[in-house]
Amino acid sequence: MDLCYVLHADHGMNASTFSSRVTIATLSDVYSAITTAIGTLKGPLHGGANEGVIKMLKEIGSLDKVDAWVADALAQKKKIMGIGHRVYKTLDPRAPHLKRMAQVLSAQLGEPKWIQMSDRIAEIMLREKHLNANVDFYSATVYYSLGIPKIGRAHV
C-alpha cells in the first residue's frame, strides 16, 4: 500500500492538489483543504476512475469477451476508463508499478481474471488508438484484489 500512496501522492499539480491549494490560498484551515482534495479525488475523471475500470471489467465478464466488448465500445465512441492521460501522452510512469502489483496480487489470490482482462484491453487500446493504460487502470485491480470497497456516491 505504501507504493500506492507514493504513486498517487507524488504526482505534481493534479486536480486534487490544485483544489486543495486553492482552498489553502483562501486562508482556510488544513482540514478544509484535505476535504476539498478528497472531494476532487472522488470524481470519476480523477481518483474515482479506478471504480469505472472495475465496473467495466465486471461488465465485460471474462477474457474471451474482451475483444468484442472493446470493439463495440470503440465503434460507439465510448470512453475506456483508465486508458490515456491528459499529461502523459506516452506511458504513465506510475502504471508499470501498479501493473506489477496487480500481477503479484492476482497470482497470490489465484484470481488472474482481472489482470488478464486488463492486459488484453491495454494491448488493444495501444494497438488501435495508440493510448496507454494509466495509473487508474491497474490500481483498479490492485484495490479490488485488496478488498478495498468502492467510494459510495451521494444520492441527491
Feature-to-residue mapping (PLM):
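Non-transmembrane, aqueous-exposed alpha-helical and coiled segments at domain scale
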Residues: 1-153
